[in-house]
Amino acid sequence: MEFVHFLKNPKKYEELGAKIPKGALLVGPPGTGKTLLAKATAGESGVPFLSISGSDFMEMFVGVGPSRVRNLFQEARQCAPSIIFIDEIDAIGRARGRGGFSGGNDERESTLNQLLVEMDGFGTTSGIVVLAGTNRPDILDKALLRPGRFDRQISIDKPDIKGREQIFQIYLKKIKLDKEPSYYSHRLAALTPGFAGADIANVCNEAALIAARNEGTQVMMEHFEAAIDRVIGGLEKKNKVISKLERRTVAYHESGHAVAGWFLEHAEPLLKVTIVPRGTAALGFAQYVPNENLLMTKEQLFDMTCMTLGGRAAEQVLLGKISTGAQNDLEKVTKMTYAQVAVYGFSDKVGLLSFPQRDDAFEMTKPYSSKTGAIIDSEVREWVAKAYERTVQLIEEHKEQVAQIAELLLEKEVLHQDDLVRVLGERPFQSSELTNYDRFKLGFQEEDEKSGQIEEDRTAENDGSSPLEPEVVPT
């Protein structure tokens, strides 16, 4: 809103001797609405909006990139005040001197140099604001990020539960629903942790498509749940040929996850578990409603590790054989445990040291000795073995219940939390704070109470009694 206010009232800033911010870098993961925010800024301020992608500057001919930069800023000056938005600026803004020895690299650097000159070349009263979007701010040239070019870095993260609820409200208005949008927005926000704005739009569209395929006249909750399943797990494949032994193995594997999570204090609440094949590899999955905690304790991560190993433990204890189905679980456990030992400083043997893992694969040397690496590897194996031992013990204690859940899964294919409560009873651990799953369930309870209150009001209206007189409160 700061840039909107400047573009609407530039003289107010200039009279006070303030220099107008020349640019802002919109930083965030894909799908969070960086481009949409830039469009909204132009719409709110009512000024011309010039948009271009970083890759549009690059062509096979030498000199085209710098020429396009000059033409873009010349056009912006002619219709000032205006906004220039450069999407995916990392295509031309990558730090100079990195990677590549070809002429194409020189062309990119020439384009970047021209952009630096243009951003620092026009006067502060010209009324041009440059917005740029990227999800890789770490690779951008330092000269591009200095004050005087991009004065602001605006972080646009994935929305929290309140943000998701507001985004759902917008997209639900475009869909023909059987209830008010507010009925769904609260529940769906709780069911979609970690979803970006683009994911939410996709869920709403998928729900409408599913309703249309099922010959429905309105979109209902079951359609939204099916859409979320499809976005998370992939396309449902009921016609996939699976042997009885494989189906039984998958049922016991998923049952192990469900029961382990049920009796672990810090495990995330289970929403549902299914053995319906989805996507390219998933033969079944358990869906949880995680709380969006900003901090995690050692105990929480240990319980999460145990819950992830629940499937492998159930196969070993109840079937006596282990399968390749736990590959994805073991991958998650390995990554999680290495982070605890080598990044978060949870290991006494490694000490209070942190070696963050890089996202790219270009790190040839590690920032620690081979001896320290051996200690880290040994600690990770020891921690995973301890977590697996705890999980096997838990599955042994609840062996009969694991078998019951597995047989129910083979019969129904999909089990919700209510089905687990009938077999396992209520969870022995209750959170002192409201969880995302509590918010999801609370929405239905409030709706039931509201509908019950409406019925009571109708009964009171029809019993022939006189309406209540309004009470006058003196002021």
Regions found by a protein language model. Give the residues of each.
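Walker A/P-loop NTP-binding motif of AAA+ ATPase domains
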Residues: 1-189, 195, 207
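Amphipathic, well-packed alpha-helical segments that form the structural scaffold of globular domains
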Residues: 1-8, 90-93, 116, 169, ...
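AAA+ ATPase "lid" subdomain C-terminal helix
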Residues: 190-222, 226-237, 258-270, 340-347, ...
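Flexible hinge/switch segments at interdomain interfaces of large molecular machines
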Residues: 43-48, 90, 135, 178-183, ...
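Short flexible coil/turn linkers enriched for glycine and charged/polar residues
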Residues: 20-22, 29-33, 43, 78, ...
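Active-site phosphate-binding and catalytic loops of NTP-dependent enzymes
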Residues: 9-16, 124-127, 178-180, 218, ...
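Soluble catalytic regions of large protease machineries
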Residues: 245-252, 258-475
